[in-house]
Amino acid sequence: MNQVVKYSICVPNLNMENTIEEALRSVLDQIDDEYEVIVVDDGSTDRSVEILRSLELEYPNLFVHELPRDPNRILAETRNMSISFARGQYLLLHIDCDDYWYPFIKDFVKVYHEIEKFKGSDFLLSGQQINMGEAKFLKSHGPYQKGHMVEDRDMWYRLAKIGAYVPLDHVVFRKRMKLKQNQILRKKFLLPIEIVRDEIRSGSSLLEFLKLFLDHKHSQNWKYRLYKLIIFPIAWLMAKRMEPLPRTTFNSDWQNLRDKAWSESGTVLHLFKKNGRIFDVGKLSPRAQIIFTHRASEISIEEVL
C-alpha cells in the first residue's frame, strides 16, 4: 500500500454489528490506496470489534481504534477522535456504520477539487449526507464542539458565519440500512428529544421553536418540527438539570444562515455558473454525471442505477 495517504474517511461506531460489515465494504471496495478509512469504536459490547478486526486483516487501508466505553462521551467527541487519527490531507466526514454507499465517493472528491480550484481550500463541501474539507482547515475550526448532540449542525453554523460552508445538492448516493428495533427507537424518538434538549441548553426558547415551525410549516420536514414542539416540555426539564451550552448553534440565526445558503445552492452546474465558470461533467463517471447534475428531489439513486 502507498504510504502517502491523501484522503481520510472518518467513521465512528457503537454497537452496529448488524450493519457495519456491509457498510464498510461498500466504502472500502470503491477506494484505492490514496484513501484510508479510520474507524473509532466507542466501546461496543456486541460483535462490532470482532468484525472490524477481521475486516482490518482483509483491507490494508482500514485502521481500527478501540476506545473504552464512556457513557458520558457523545458522538461529537468520537468523531473528533477519528479525525485526530487521520493522516490524510483531506477529510471525508459523516460516513457512518449504518450507511451503504454506492460507488460515487471518488466522484464527490473530484467535484470538491474542481471547486477548490477557484475557492481555495478553506471551505467545507456539504453534500447530501457526505462532507469533505481540507484537514488542516477543519481541525483549526473545531472541528466538533463537545456537548452538542447535533455536532454537524454546530460545525456548519460556525463555518457558515465565515463564508466557508458550501452546500451542494445532488442525488443521494447512500442508503440507510435496516437497524435493530432499539436503534430505530433511539433514532426516531429519543435522539430528537436530546437534540431539543441541547437547543434549549444553547438558549432557544419555546417562542423561537414556534417561530421556526411557523416560518417553515410548508417545508418537507414540518412534521419533525411539529414533533420538536410537542416534546419541548420533556426536553426543557432535562435541559434545566444540565450545564448550559454556548449560544452559537441552535437558534434562528443558524436557521436563517443555512436556509440562505441552501436557497442559493444547487447542483455543481449551478455552483459553477454562479461563479462564472463551466463545469466539465466529462471528468465524472457516466452515472456520476447524472448524480451531480440533478437535485436530490429530482431523481433517486435507484433511477440512476
Summary of predicted features, one role per range:
Residues 99-131:
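Conserved donor NDP-sugar-binding/catalytic core segment of glycosyltransferases
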Residues 88-100:
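Short beta-strand-to-loop acidic/aromatic patch adjacent to the donor-nucleotide binding site
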Residues 41-51, 71, 96-99:
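A conserved acidic beta->alpha catalytic loop
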Residues 149-155:
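Acidic donor-binding loop at a coil-to-helix junction in glycosyltransferase catalytic cores
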Residues 129, 168-206, 210:
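Active-site donor/metal-binding and catalytic loop motifs
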